[in-house]
Each structure stands twice: as C-alpha cells, then as structure tokens.
Design a protein with these regions (language model features):
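Structural marker of alpha-solenoid helical repeat scaffolds
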Residues: 84, 118-124, 158
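Residue-level recognition of tetratricopeptide repeat
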Residues: 62-63, 97, 137, 171
Length: 179
C-alpha cells in the first residue's frame, strides 16, 4: 500500500498507474472537463400505415422491441409488413419470436414454419439460420424434441448459429440419455 499526496494538483491532470514487476497492470486517468452537447431527442415512430417499405416496417418493429417502447407495439409493424408481403421472412421470424416470448409456441411455429419454407425454397442451406433455430425452439417448447433436434442441427450450417444450435442439440441428447 502506498499513499501519494496529490493535494493542490488539478484533478484533470491525475493519472494513476499500477505497476507490478516493471509492467503496468492497470492505468486510470481523468476525463477532460468538457460540456458535451445533449443528443437530439428520438423521433416518434410513424404509424405502420405511414411507412413506405416492408423493410422499414420490420426495422421499426425491431427498434420498438429493442427499446421496449411504452406506447407503440412492434407487432403492429410486423403485421402491416405481412399484410403487404405475407412471404417476408424477417417479419414472419419476428412474429414467431414474439409468440415464443408470449408462450404461444403453436402460433410461433406457424410463422416460423413459413419463414423457413420461404428461406429454403431455393436454398436448403440458407444464408441465415436464425428462423431455422427459432423454429427449433418453438418445437422444443411443444415437446416435439426429435423435430426440434433436426431444426437445431440444420441451423448449425450457418456459422452465427453453430454455438446455439449445437448446444440445443446437446441438451436434447442429454434429455434422451444419449451422451
């Protein structure tokens, strides 16, 4: 333990270095005293019918979910997107996830089955495995473990879903005593 007298020094000039065996292991310094501008206030979302594209409907719904907006529902934006384009994979996946979070796994499965069917129409190993993984979740929560396992395994084709997919497969294997 060491005490250092810094009395009389301006706070903004302080730097503290912890050194062990000649090597810095931690360093701290003050932030400059500056008044930063306040960021602009967030703009209110347009109503779903005022938004021009399905992509913007999806992105607005995603934003509302991410920030848990108190007065707007993301579902309104996803549903409007699906009204305009029932085959939009993003909105079908988003609705499926929303219903998973609400415990409505059967309804979630309907949206996710559609998303996966559209994704795999021309490419059995789609670019993004998220809807495939999410369908696995909906099936697992319905107790349809063999189908869920197959979906989780299929989702591992995509690098972004390998960890979660293999882990979910391992969970089901352990439940079945298949170590």
């Amino acid at each position: 333990e060491e005490t250092v007298d810094v009395q009389g020094l301006p706070f903004s000039t302080l730097t503290l270095d912890f050194v062990k065996d000649g090597r810095a292991v931690m360093s701290w310094h003050t932030e400059p005293d500056e008044i930063r501008p306040i960021p602009d206030a967030a703009e209110a979302a347009l109503l779903p019918e005022q938004i021009k594209t399905v992509e913007q409907l999806f992105l607005t719904g995603l934003h509302l979910e991410q920030y848990r907006h108190a007065t707007y529902s993301p579902v309104d934006y996803y549903e409007e997107g699906l009204r305009r384009d029932p085959d939009d994979v993003r909105c079908n996946n988003a609705m499926g996830l929303w219903y998973i979070r609400k415990g409505r796994f059967d309804v979630a499965g309907q949206y996710l089955e559609k998303a996966v069917k559209i994704l795999q129409k021309r490419n059995p190993t789609p670019y993004d495995g998220e809807p495939v993984y999410n369908l696995g979740l909906a099936l697992k929560y319905q107790g349809r473990y063999e189908e869920a396992y197959n979906r989780f395994y299929k989702a591992t084709w995509n690098g972004g879903w390998q960890d979660a997919g293999y882990f979910a497969c391992a969970q089901i294997s352990c439940m079945n005593g298949d170590y």
